[in-house]
Amino acid sequence: MTLDERDLELIREELGRDPNATERAMFENMWSEHCAYRSTRHLLRQLPSEADHVIVGPGDDAAVVAIDDEWAVVVGIESHNHPSYVDPYNGAATGVGGIVRDVLSMGAFPIALLDPLRFGPLDGERVPYLVDGVVRGISDYGNRIGVPTVGGELEFDPSYERNPLVNVMCVGIVRRSEIVRGRADRPGDVLVLVGARTGRDGIGGAAFASEELGEESEEEDRPAVQIGDPFTERQLIIAIREAVERGLVKGCKDLGAAGLTCAATEMAADGGTGVEIDVFKVPLREEGMEPWEIMLSESQERMLLVVAPEDVDEVIEICRKYGLEASVVGRVTDDGYLTVKDGDDVIARVPAEFLADGAPEVEWEEEPYSYPENVDVPEPDPEDLVRSVLSSPNVSPALREWVYRQYDHEVQGRTVVKPGHDAAVMWLQHEGLEDVALALTTDSNPRHVLIDPKTGTEGCVAEALRNLATVGAEPLCLVDCLNFGSPENPRVYYQLRRSIEGLGKAAREFEVPVVGGNVSLYNEHEVDGPVNPTPVIGAVGVIRGLDYLEDFPREPEEGEAVIVLGETREELGGSLYLIEYHGIKGGKVPRVRYREERALHDLLRRIARKNMVSSVTDVSTGGLLAAVAELLGPVGASLSLSEVPNSVSRWDFLLLSESHGRAIVTTDRPDDVLGAAEEAGVPAQVVGEVTGDGVLRISVGPVDVSLDREELEELWRSPLHYLE
């Protein structure tokens, strides 16, 4: 990135002179889209972020939300998209490391990771290499630092072929008395740099993330990708937590984008102070580094602590006990400036608040667009349709299992509901939380968002909260990771603005605060153009009282009833069926009917917590066909889906509509479930029973389909040949 003339004029006016080379480099990174959110700050302000239980909202390294009077959950979400295309293994690994340190910087102990991933079609020349590298990077790093990866998403679409999306969400737990903020608010305090030595890896990473990828990116941009060291990260987690427990940490920041410049500047700006950094005191991994390189290096596994002078020796002693370097590199001042020194020489001096928050906001031109709602859909051959949908990489449970089997999802011994379900459940175990768990999920549907950005994003929120409800959880908060193309493209900027509007509307309707997030723009390639608009929604819920989870969810047994909850409507816009099977972009995108959706969520929580059901899944990508196959295929069932509450005109629409507000449950107490549904005002119908013979029989209108377990598993496993 380079500063434009308007930026330079503003900087000259503030400084009263031209910025020198070091100052200019710092402004280029701090005022990049990646750091400054220049195109989205004004849009994000409309999101509801406040609630009585929100302790720290947007603006710090991670959000903090109260669980009770003593404990809080810390949650953050980040993207590492460009680095993961250039170097998939290290790009993904350092994405994990960075978000873990964000959660750690708030004083929390990280307990879970989720990884929403998006790639091009598996038959793409470079895609299997990207998938393998990204999954190994996440697996190796997460497993070695001892934080379980318990959920996420996996999607394949041509728009991601040269710009994969690698998002990571991290959740931690902290005593409210031990929460640390990313600020330096006491002049005289000392800045201590802890962790790995500083090298040249990742220099300019913030600027690199603010540009589109090109044909030469794999080689030209490799120096902008950081290299991770999970062993050092593990020691950092232990050491920082010990220092926090002893009350020695007054402020803390991860050194991520723009490195030491960003960490020091934001701490000063948020604390209303200044900071002085001496680059001569920064431990280096490479000789001959220039001051600007030291200030902008994004070398991993480094954190900047604010420590009282009298506590410095104790903090350094703790770090050394765990084999970590810890060096005093500066101090907090009262002058409001970031002053960079090299020994006695002043290298740079700029107002901290101006550097952190002074980048002008940008409103780009936008170009509204729409796709036709009324589209002609050829009637398919039933056998071909069923096999095509169930063998899609976007449906295959086997492909997702191939991913999560590489992760240690049970380390720490907290994982009660494991990957493969609609939401993960993590038992908290701590004193006072023995009967409390967190439910975690991430969700997005870029195909819906592409066709209708606002309505599609509302649906992403509804699905995330619906998934929490399937395991009996009450929602606590949302975070978002907004992955879009260049805002300079008028269609993309329209998508971005409307998507954020949809997120805000849904959050207000469901009364769940959006407490933090990440914006990743310029996700496009000079050949392929922008990725599909991809707002990933992370949701955290709380469960109080865990007895029902001893026997839920479980595999359904022979004779249990299968019940479909909610109405299926003729809403196929952006569906897997229209886009992937027919190649049609258009149709009516599923609309969120908030009263109906809230009623379903309440019902799902009730029937789960009262052990009325053995298993449950919501209906989303791939419609009823994908949902019943995943839930019932391995055990076998006989289903008449024409009985489903519906308002559709064709059997294929009934089978593959992606209407919201629906779920499928199995139960040996059908009368109780139907009674609860009637009381909640949710349409419900028994559509068949579990047979236990390993054969899935589906009757819908004039069509009868039968698949045995082996056939179904063969379809699900068919995409794996690209990866094995």
UniProtKB/Swiss-Prot annotation:
Pathway: Purine metabolism; IMP biosynthesis via de novo pathway; 5-amino-1-(5-phospho-D-ribosyl)imidazole from N(2)-formyl-N(1)-(5-phospho-D-ribosyl)glycinamide: step 1/2. It is found in: Cytoplasm. One of its GO terms (biological process) is 'de novo' IMP biosynthetic process. Substrate binds at residues 79-82, 101, 226, 298-300, 520. Mg(2+) 2 binds at residues 102, 254. GO terms for molecular function: ATP binding; magnesium ion binding; phosphoribosylformylglycinamidine synthase activity. Mg(2+) 1 binds at residues 78, 518. The active site is at 34, 80 (proton acceptor). It catalyses: N(2)-formyl-N(1)-(5-phospho-beta-D-ribosyl)glycinamide + L-glutamine + ATP + H2O = 2-formamido-N(1)-(5-O-phospho-beta-D-ribosyl)acetamidine + L-glutamate + ADP + phosphate + H(+). One of its GO terms (cellular component) is cytoplasm. It is an enzyme of class 6 (ligase). CDD domains: PurL_repeat1, PurL_repeat2. Its EC number is 6.3.5.3. Part of the phosphoribosylformylglycinamidine synthase complex involved in the purines biosynthetic pathway. Catalyzes the ATP-dependent conversion of formylglycinamide ribonucleotide (FGAR) and glutamine to yield formylglycinamidine ribonucleotide (FGAM) and glutamate. The FGAM synthase complex is composed of three subunits. PurQ produces an ammonia molecule by converting glutamine to glutamate. PurL transfers the ammonia molecule to FGAR to form FGAM in an ATP-dependent manner. This is Phosphoribosylformylglycinamidine synthase subunit PurL. The lineage of its organism: Archaea, Methanobacteriati, Methanobacteriota, Methanomada group, Methanopyri. The gene is purL.
